[in-house]
Each structure stands twice: as C-alpha cells, then as structure tokens.
Amino acid sequence: MKRKSLRRTIPLLFRLLFLACLFTSDEAEAGWIEDAPDKTIIHLNVWTLPDPNNPDTFTRAEVAGVNLFKQRFPDFFAERYSEKYKALPGKYGQHNWDNVEIQLHKSTGIVVEGVEVDLLQIAGDLAPDILYVNFRKSDNYIQAGFLYPLDKPEDGYLGDLREAEIDGDGISRSDSDLGGMTDEELNCRINPKIWPVIRRKGPHGKVQTWAVPYGGALGKVLAYRKDLFDEYGISHPTVDWTWDDLMAAAKKITNPAKGHYGLQLGRGKHESWYWITFLWSAGGEVMVYDPEDDSWLCTFDTHEAAIALDFYTHLSAEKWIDKQGKIRRGYSSKDASENSAKWERGEIGMQFMYVDEKLLATINPEVVGMVPVPLGPTGKRGAELNSRMMGLFSRIEDPVVRDAAWEYIRFYDAREAVALKTQIMVEGGLGRFINPKYLRMFGYSEIERLSPKGWAEYFDIAIATGKPEPYGKNSNVAYAMMTFPIQEAEQLMLNDQLPQTDAARLQVMHELLIKHNHRANVEMIGLVTPEERSTRRTVATIVLLAIVIAFTFVFRKISRIFTAPGEGDGEQQTWAFRKYLPAYLMLIPAALSILVWSYIPVLRGSAMAFFDYQILRESTWVGVDNFGDLLFDDAWWLSVWNALRYSFLVIALTFMPPIVLAIFLQEVPRGKLVFRTIYYLPAVITGLVTVLMWKQFYEPSENGALNALMLHIPAIGFVGVGLALLIVALAFARRLHLNEMYGGAIGFIGAGILLFLGFSSLANPILFPGGEAMVDSLLHIPLRLFSFMPEPNKWLTNPETAMISCVIPMVWAGMGPGCLIYLAALKGIPDDYYEAADIDGASFIDKILFVVFPMLKALILINFVGAFIGSWYAATGNILLMTGGGGNTEVAGLHIWYKAFTYLKFGPATAMAWMLGFMLIGFTVHQLQILSRVEFRAATKKD
C-alpha cells in the first residue's frame, strides 16, 4: 500500500514542479510589435531613458527630446517605411502600417561594479535594441559581434559610405552615393577625429561603421577652484600653463592638516585615465595601428612615457615635510569615495574633467574656472577626445524594430531635437553654458555675451589637441595594463626606494613600463612566438593529463571512503538499491536539483576552457592554449598566491579567535551576558555598512580613526604586544612538549613567531626607515623603541597592510556569532572532566589543551573545512568592496571575475576556474576522509 502511494506521489510532485517552472518563467523580450485594435505599436528597448520625474533643466530637455521623437515618429514612418513595408509583407509582417506609434522602454538589469551591464544582458539574451558604446570597449563589442553595421546601402541608415572621403574637414560623398543621412547631418554630428573609432574592420574583415556619437564630442580640460587659488595667493591657470606650473600650484595648495590637496587623482584598475593626459603631453602613445600589417601594438614603454610616469609619481607620492615637521606624501587626493565631496567643499584645487560640446558645463563660473590641460616638457598638449555613442544590437531579429531603433538614434541629435533641447535649457537658465555656436544656430545669439569667458575657446583647444581614448584591439584592458606600472612606481616612491638622480630614476621608470608593456602586448594583442606557443601547449598537455590521472584516483578514493562497510567480515556494500529504496527515492529531488543547477552547468561550461569563447559569434577551438597561457601567466600565479595569503589570514584571524573568545566568555566569573552582547552587537550591522565604516577607519591621513590611534603608540607597544603573544604561544608549546606532543608544540612555536613578526612589523616604519642602511637602523633601535610612527599608514593601498586590512572587518563583525557554536559545545563538556583535571593538578592551559580541544575536535574540524572553503568563496566579494584588487590584493577569484566580465575573455577565465578547482580538490578530499570517520553523538545533559 505504501509503495503504491509512493508511486502516485512522486509523479505528481514532478508535474507540480514542471507547472511551477512554466508559470514562473517570464521570458523578457527586447523590441516587439503589438497589434492594437486600430493601430500598430512598435515597442523599443533602450539601454537608458531620461527620468521624467527629475526636475533639473538638463533632464527636462532630454525628456522633451524623447517625447518629441515619439510624437514625430508616425511622420518619419509614413515618409520612409510605410510603403516599403506594405510591399514586402513576407519580410515585415501583416500589420496596420497606416497608423503606427512607438513606445520606448528603459532596459533593466543587474548593475555590478566593474561589469558592463549590457554584457550581462547580452549573455542572458535580454539585450536592449540600442546599446551604449564608448571608445575603449568599442573594439571588443565590434569583434564580439554585438553591433550591427550602420552603413549597409540596403538599410539606408547612414547611407553608402564605401566611396566616401573622410579628412580633417569631415565626410564627403558624390550625390549618387548619398542615401540615409546627408553629409551635412553627418558632419554636424560626427567630429572628423571620431571616424577612425566608429568606422573600421569588423569581425569578418570588412570596413564598416558600427556606432554613432550623440551629445557632441567630449574634451578633457583642467578645472580649478578659484577660491583656493586666491586663498593661497596663486595666479589663476592660463592657456600657457605647463607641467611646472601645475606642480608649483599643487605644492602651494596642498595642506593635509586643513584637508586641502592640489590635484584630484584616483586609484583602482583605471587609475591610468589620469596619467594618460601626461603621457600624450610628453609625446608618448598608448597603442599604434599599422595599416600595412593590419595590427595593433602597445607602445607605452618609451622614454617619453617614463618622463610622464616620473612626473605623475611625484604628484602622487613625493616625500615632503610640512610646517609642523610631519612627513607628507604627494600633492593629490586619491580617495575616490570622498573626492567628489571634497571638490564641492573646496578642498581640492584642480581636477581633470570632460567638457561637453553642446552643454559646456554647469559648474559655477564664479567659483570654478577651466583651462586646457597643461603643456608638456616638449610643448605638446595631450588632451583627450571622447564621445558617448549609440549602436544597434546585432541580434535584433525583426527589421521593423531595427528600423525604429535607428530612427531613435538618428533623431536624438537631429537639428529639430537639438533646437528643442536648446530652447528648454535657455528658458531654464542654462543658456550661458551652451556652446555659443548652438546659441547662434538657434537664434539665441544675444545670450552669447553671458557665456563664461574663454570656455568655448578652451573647448576648441581641447578638441584640436585631443587624442581619442584608446580604441584599438582589446583596448577595454588598456587602462588596467597601464595602471600596473603606475602602482609599482608609487609604491617604490612611498618606500623611498627610488634613486635620487633624475637619470637613474627615469631608468627605473622605463624598466617598469617595458615590463608591463610587454605584458599588455601578450594579453591584449596576443603576441606569443610560435616556439613559445609550442612550449606552452606541451606543458599544458602534460599538466592536464596529470590532473586527469589524479582526478581518477581522487574520485576512486572518495567512492571507497563513503561506501558503507559490510556487516561482519563481509565485503563493503555498494548501492543496495532494494534495501535502501525509500531513502534513494527521497534523495532524488535534491539530487536532481543539484545535478540540474550545479553539475550540468559546470560540465557545459567546462568546454569553454578549450575555446576562444564568443557570446554571439561562433567560438573558435583553441585546444589547450588557454591552459598553456595561464600556466605561464605571472599575474595568474600572483593572484593564486594572494588567495593563499587571504585564506591563511582568514583562518588565522576569523577561525581561531572565536574559539578563544568562547573559552573566555565561558570562564569569565561575572557579566557573561553583558560581554556576550557586546561581542555579538557588530553582527546586527549589515555587511555594506560594516565595509563603509571600516573604509572610513582606514582613511590614509591622520584624521582616520585607525591612524589616529596608531600614531600615538610607540614602537615598543607593537613589539610588546607581539612579544606577549609569543610568550603565550610558547607556554602552550611547553605543555605540549612535556606531554611528548612535539608536532603540536612546533605548531604553537611557529604560530607565536608569526604573531610576533606580524605585530612587530607595524613598528618597521619607526625602527627601519626607508632608504637607511640596516646597520644604522640596528644601532638606533634602542632609542627608536619609544618613537612614534613618522607618517600615517595607507592601509588599503600599501601592499604590506592591504590584505590584512580586508580581513580585520570580518574579525570584528564575525567573532561574536562565530563563538556561539563553541559556547554551546562547551556547555556539553561534563564538569567531571574539569574536576578530574583539577585533581591531577592541571593548569588553565592544560585544561584547554587536554580537555576542551579533544572534546571540540570534531566541531573544530568541521568548522575549519567550512572556513577554509568559505575563505576562497567569499574572497572575491570582500576584496572587490575593500580595495578592488589594489594594493596587491587581487585574489584568484577576482582575477577570474575581471578576466570574464570586464575583458570578455571567457575561455581563459574558465580555464582559470578549473585550475583553481583542481588546486582545492585535494584538500577537500582529505577533509572528507577525516569527516567520514567522525562519529556524532548528542551532548549529555548536565544535572
């Protein structure tokens, strides 16, 4: 009867599960066509739309432009498409083409820092019809097949450009070749310098146009706070300003005691955005294109680049002494989270910013001025030219939707739309900030006299001297590649390890650039010699074969470990389906869920490791090349080493302390509830708040909470804490040694030494100043033991402290909850054990070593496995929030994340993920073997 009921129940459960999947699935589409009773509605999905609820003038103008497009669309449709659609119903469908309207929808999706949102949408088949494109990611999007060419003659979008002539004056075509947009429209919208960015070879080797700018060109200028310049008696910058003038002004303004800094710079993987202006002004280039070979090459390793890096490093980290005798570093603020607020408060003297061609700026000209970027040492000015761009998604299936999407792109900056936006901005009080040429174009020439003096001229200089943001092969990675030498050079200067002479220092800078330029050419361009490629393939094949063999033995061992022993002297039982049928049936839903949502995706995704995987285009088989590249990739192995460091710190600081805390809370004679509440309180704070709070604690100036504390502790304090911990560890080691437990004794000695070195290292800046000979430092140690730290610590950017700084917030927030399970387990230890230990004369340490730890051994082991795996699993998110991988904290998981979702290298990222799994599987099997022998029993109830 039971079996019959079971046979009926299980199929019913699967049917309900299937129906639930059907009803909960909500397949989102991009654009589509709706047949209303008396009209046809074309729905268009756009990556973003202006918010109609935002009352600011600029947004109201943008909203008005969108509304005008929806109002005028029926006229455009009737003029350009209605008759064509009626004539070809097989291609365009049977719809009411006499009454058509359009509805726009803002694309939605998960927003993840560091990841292109539209990339996630494309991967999930939810891409908008109109994509946002910028210069640096344009090549990746073009070569990946994300963009639809806009100059197909049959479409009539841009028209036929095959015979077009493009020069410094713009584009020109013969009348017979026109079609689509006119030359006048194109020249009004597209700056001649932008044509190489949007018109180039695609994935099939054909030169086509892939995107169209909107909003006008963007030029980089130098903005400055007039109030700060006046406060420090500095003449305002001019068009003739040089690097020396910039440095002199930054030095005069910088006053960390008041929170004033000369120049705003930044950190993170794209810090080189700030440096690239100096690179171009010095005469250097990021990458160059050879039309004969149709190839790109990274070239930021020249002597000019070294000069730019040297100047930038001095701005960032040069050592100087303020009026109070305190050591300071650099003349810039690089705190990304606070820079915007500091600029608004008037605490930063200068910053680089973009100026829009149409709306020059909305800053207060009474407080903020702007000039072109300073001239370099050779008299060159290297501003940046950029532009926002729109492109059509290549997988728009319905040509009607694609035509409607193009009309949106075309109208966005059409003369009619720009005229309306200009009118609204003039009426809203922004007229004086509009480029005078548009004021004259639309009849507002009388407002031109109100425009801030020189702004239009400076914009023209920025465009004339500007170079397009890197747009070459895989240029989405360019900023990250150029940031590596910047970070290394800064750290060398912070550690006082750079030569004092200009020639020697430039040589060091040049060597850094050569090293990382070579890495950029390998990772971005793929420059690997045939001989090296052959070597990599051979090594990768050998390693993969070894892994397969190892996996075979590992899974065989797992099978043996978890096979139930036979009864008596019989053989081990295998599956025993008949005996355990009910148990197997109950496990089926859970097993199927794990199979469907874990193992099948893993197996399907694993094939990506052997391909140059493309989301839309056909992927190319590369064999073991991805594995060969990562085996010879220093950056990958550095990330693995960082992951090991992070895991060790997590185990040392978040696994063991809760055990110690639980013992103390158990033994404290009074106030147990109060202490437990105090230690548990941090757990009620959300993770994001914890991160933000600790990032404020880590502020690199003396105003940071942690620095304010550390600056008032003498060197002997750090050494004393380390020495105290060493003594405690040695006390434990001594008791273990007396009981002939030598392995444990050695472990405690090693832990004590590490704790001593770790805490004592905080005194290194006091005891061993940078640039001083070791002998001199040793002679001065007795006197320096009572000295204080000479300067604030840069906790999250200093490679020596960044990793542990990422772990400390976890310790603070996790110790309280982590000790609860041990407190519960300690309650299960019978009092008889402690009494027997007292009778035997056991000390407090003896009770911990020979009563507590043996009783908690199984629990500690289980938690250790979870803590170890969790340290690898959670490292990516924690590091991303705290440092973004800066300060030599990029762990393996974060490295894989950037490789896949920022650089679109899915094949190499998958190979890295598998390699990481291979490394961890041995540890996991070893722990499974131990856990298979653990016997669990309920704790005995105390009387």
Model regions and ranges:
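Glycine-centered hinge/linker elements that transmit conformational signals in sensory
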Residues: M247-K252, D290-S333
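Extracytoplasmic/periplasmic solute-binding protein
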Residues: V197-L222, D245-L297
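C-terminal capping/gating helix-and-loop segments adjacent to ligand/active sites or protein-protein/ligand interfaces
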Residues: R449-L527
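C-terminal lobe and pocket-closing loops
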Residues: E357-P365, P377-T483
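Conserved N-terminal structural module of periplasmic/extracytoplasmic solute-binding proteins
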Residues: P11, A28-F146, D496-L545, F551, ...
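A structural signal for multi-pass alpha-helical bundles of membrane permease subunits
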Residues: P582-D943
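Short, solvent-exposed loop/beta-turn-alpha elements that line the ligand-binding surface or hinge
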Residues: D151-R189, V239, G284-I307, L375-A383
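Hinge/lid segment of periplasmic solute-binding proteins
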Residues: F135-G219, G369-V371
